[in-house]
């Protein structure tokens, strides 16, 4: 059966900051083919000088009969993926704790930039990280929405223009 592992690991120095994102599209929604078999595991971790700052881990598993029904419910439930096949996460992480006012400004700018058409939200899991998670029916609208938040964060955090990474244009 198809298996995929997506593991991202970031170690940040005390003065370092980063913006990262991950988009996951399940199945082939344009062809009407949902995700109904295989196993996907994701692990995203950010390590600060003081230790682990953030760990995001998820598993979708149709291969193991013990987990297949739970995976099906998670993908269908309004408390889970709500039937949407695309999940996106965008995060701002810092090696040193962010001041409360700065965290609030990043949170506010994320909420203002995230299109209302996307099912998503922004949160601050701890003093090092601000996270946006969103669901969609297609990858493109989600990528555009998270791109708008990324642009807002670049302006807010670093007073930089919203230039796109070259790899996004290929």
Question: Where would I find each of the regions flagged by the language model?
Answer:
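Internal, conserved structured core segments that host functional sites
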Residues: 1-36, 45
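A structural signal for small-residue-enriched, beta-sheet-centric alpha/beta enzyme cores
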Residues: 24-170
